């Protein structure tokens, strides 16, 4: 299905055969380490894959209450979904105008610096406290003293052994390699940890193209 960012399939069948097919899949996959996964695990997998989630990482234009809540395909890295060669479609004129200029915002990947995080916790006598699941909250991102964007999803990747996040950043701060800071809460106090803009997806296995 692609939601995990890895090779996957959807199986559609009559409900009466669901248990039989499930048992067959589990039995056939046991030699390959097949394991059922719940939504918390899937949410981490989609984070590692750099996949955005509606109403978490972006707001639908149908639900946006103010213009600042809206995002265009160009700002979300989805310019490839807009075909301006088509003669007419709703919104074509606006898309054509936006395509002529650089997007004001970019949806990017962030990697939080482990040493920076470790230092913040060491200052209060603790080891880094890592989230057990992906978090979903608007979290400020800074360049020096200026807020230049906000992260929307993040968490510790057990696969990559890295603290990663997805974020909306102003175009001038969105280039891969840009050094920034992300807000973290350490013992109920707001701190800033160093973070770097990195290429999405975080995890991109060759096997998913099979």
Briefly describe each language-model feature range.
Residues 1-210:
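Conserved, structured C-terminal
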């Amino acid at each position: 299905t692609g939601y995990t960012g890895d090779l996957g399939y959807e199986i559609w069948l009559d409900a009466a055969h669901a248990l039989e097919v499930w048992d067959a899949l589990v039995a056939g996959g046991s030699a390959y380490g097949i394991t059922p996964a719940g939504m918390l695990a899937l949410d981490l997998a989609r984070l590692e894959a750099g996949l955005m989630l509606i109403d978490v990482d972006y707001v639908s234009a149908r639900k946006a209450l103010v213009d600042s809540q809206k995002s265009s395909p160009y700002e979300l890295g989805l310019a490839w979904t807009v075909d301006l060669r088509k003669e007419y479609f709703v919104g074509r004129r606006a898309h054509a105008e936006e395509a002529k200029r650089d997007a004001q915002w970019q949806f990017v990947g962030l990697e939080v610096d482990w040493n920076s995080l470790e230092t913040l916790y060491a200052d209060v006598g603790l080891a880094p406290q890592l989230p057990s699941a992906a978090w979903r909250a608007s979290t400020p991102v800074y360049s020096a003293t200026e807020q230049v964007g906000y992260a929307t999803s993040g968490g510790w990747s057990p696969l990559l052994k890295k603290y990663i996040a997805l974020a909306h950043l102003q175009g001038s701060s969105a280039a891969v390699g840009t050094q920034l800071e992300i807000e973290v809460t350490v013992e109920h106090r707001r701190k800033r940890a160093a973070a770097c803009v990195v290429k999405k997806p975080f995890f991109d296995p060759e096997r998913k193209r099979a």
